[in-house]
Amino acid sequence: MAIRSYRILTPDTRNRSVSGFDGRVQLDPQKKLTSGQHHCGKGRNGRGIITARHRGGGHKRLYRQIDFRRNKEHISGEIVTIEYDPNRSAYICKVHYKNGDKMYILHPRGVMIGDTILSGPKAPISIGNALPLTNMPLGTAIHNIEITLGKGGQLARAAGAVAELIAKEDRSATLRLPSGEVRLISENCSATIGQVGNITANNRSFGKAGAKRWLGKRSEVRGVAMNPVDHPHGGGEGRTPIGRKKPVTPWGYSALGKKSRKRNRYSDASILRRRE
């Protein structure tokens, strides 16, 4: 969908832009495919202590139950609607299967209302179909990729995300992920063909701080604006430098270039090249 800009009437609309909804995108979900969600604490743990900073507030949302497994094998489904989902950057599709089931899936780019999709090992190589990696040709663009067989897609699910199948060898498939990481995944795991829709989601401009607060994101305060008790960069008279060779986090760790991934993880052997 194209990015829509506002006519300048107030300061907050001067630089604000949103994803343009056309007649195809609906806003009201089907009630049976939604559930309530309670954001307890907004970044706090069970004791009320902040464990994830810059979270809080936000508009109340209904969770749309998305089918990431795509395990309706050999049962064709028709795309009935394309809908907005406040819980993710991508749009979602409502699918009516021939056996009567109704489910939401991620909207693949190029899929239109009335199109038919299929899942299973014998599904054709077509956008929106889900099948195991072993049945896909090399160079296929995919999204919603499983890491563990049967668990459902976990990789390449954001708006505009797409991965590439670049090799298959010894019951493993080599994928190039959107982050630039190259890793091995079992070729029995399934994925959906195509790219996730709403590719212009990153081009929008919020225009004001309140638009971020609607999403449950609080402002980030600079360390030099804090007191010494709150941040290693804090304190001093006036515009004082941080007093260190390199910037650090609030807990004293290096803030630039330090790898934060834990060592000796079980998945290290599957990663052939780190992300860029």
From Swiss-Prot:
Pfam families with a match to the protein in the record: Ribosomal_L2, Ribosomal_L2_C
GO biological process: mitochondrial translation
Regions crossing the membrane: none
Major localization listed first in the record, in broad terms: plastid
Region (Disordered): 225-276
InterPro entries on file: NA-bd_OB-fold, Rib_uL2_dom2, Ribosomal_uL2, Ribosomal_uL2_bac/org-type, Ribosomal_uL2_C, Ribosomal_uL2_dom3, Ribosomal_uL2_RNA-bd_dom, Translation_prot_SH3-like_sf
GO molecular function: rRNA binding; structural constituent of ribosome; transferase activity
A GO CC term attached to the entry: chloroplast
Intracellular or extracellular location(s): Plastid, Chloroplast
Alphabetized UniProt keyword annotations: Chloroplast, Plastid, Ribonucleoprotein, Ribosomal protein
Quaternary structure (record): Part of the 50S ribosomal subunit.
PANTHER family assigned to the protein according to its UniProt record, in alphabetical order: LARGE RIBOSOMAL SUBUNIT PROTEIN UL2M, RIBOSOMAL PROTEIN L2
Family, per entry: Belongs to the universal ribosomal protein uL2 family.
Protein name per Swiss-Prot or TrEMBL: Large ribosomal subunit protein uL2c
